[in-house]
Amino acid sequence: MTPEHLPTEQYEAQLAEKVVRLQSMMAPFSNLVPEVFRSPVSHYRMRAEFRIWHDGDDLYHIIFDQQTKSRIRVDSFPAASELINQLMTAMIAGVRNNPFLRHKLFQIDYLTTLSNQAVVSLLYHKKLDDEWRQEAEALRDALRAQNLNVHLIGRATKTKIELDQDYIDERLPVAGKEMIYRQVENSFTQPNAAMNIQMLEWALDVTKGSKGDLLELYCGNGNFSLALARNFDRVLATEIAKPSVAAAQYNIAANHIDNVQIIRMAAEEFTQAMNGVREFNRLQGIDLKSYQCETIFVDPPRSGLDSETEKMVQAYPRILYISCNPETLCKNLETLSQTHKVERLALFDQFPYTHHMECGVLLTAK
């Protein structure tokens, strides 16, 4: 595979290999055949980052080969959304002959939505001034004249210039309801929007008929907690990143959801609060004991759950675990399987044509 060519004819074969690999990894814990969710074969990534290479009067996007570290010129990127591909061409054309915009530009980041909005961030090794802003505004206006719904941001050391805003609003059809999600530049969002819809619908399916409340750790912008709110009496969710918490609060209001409470704290801190080890001012006014959480949802970073959080989640009758790293999931299952059994298993092909797998498990207490 090269950045400008996807082996789409090999899609089914690479997916079949992942199914076999996941089943093998899960064999000590479950003999379930994974429910398999396919990605679009191209234009599935809604965000992408590229270094910018200056070559005389020319400049272009590059990525680095993971093995050889050699640079690869990228003029089109079929893994990314069609809007990113349009913007890649338009941005280079707009920057190439403009000294204010091209000087010391070293990276461009793209974030797009299925609703055809984009935030483009230009990263510089120089101070950004009013002349830069004026030229960037002219570029933005030229892009919009091409019917590209785009917001531009300039970044340099300790500097961030938003020409309009640093977010876009995604609209996803999820099990018969349109969900609105504010996505903030430089914050985590699910990279494959089509796959995200399938993940949300799978999570809704495995939790239908749930009793009581839901606790979610690592909630981000509320991606899962807001979609799952319809299946539970109440949802209590934690997140540490300030921009993500702010986006989650916006998303609660935008979706007219009244049964979700977001707390800004780390999963490890919340574990201490639940266990009565420490008290936190951030929890004033929130009666943790009033929540009857029968289900806990975790979508941890690649490192998986730490040992204290492992112990904490074992106290819940049902554990819904979305993993971007099945190796750490299996490590966690060595502990979790002592008290819980795997009821559902899913493979989400979030990153086609790569080694990476995303998976989901529903665990119920033995």
Curated annotation (Swiss-Prot):
It comes from the Bacteria. GO terms for molecular function: rRNA binding; tRNA (uracil(54)-C5)-methyltransferase activity, S-adenosyl methionine-dependent; tRNA binding. GO terms for biological process: tRNA methylation. Keywords: Methyltransferase, S-adenosyl-L-methionine, Transferase, tRNA processing. Disulfide bonds: none annotated. It holds the Pfam family tRNA_U5-meth_tr. Belongs to the class I-like SAM-binding methyltransferase superfamily. RNA M5U methyltransferase family. TrmA subfamily. This is tRNA/tmRNA (uracil-C(5))-methyltransferase.
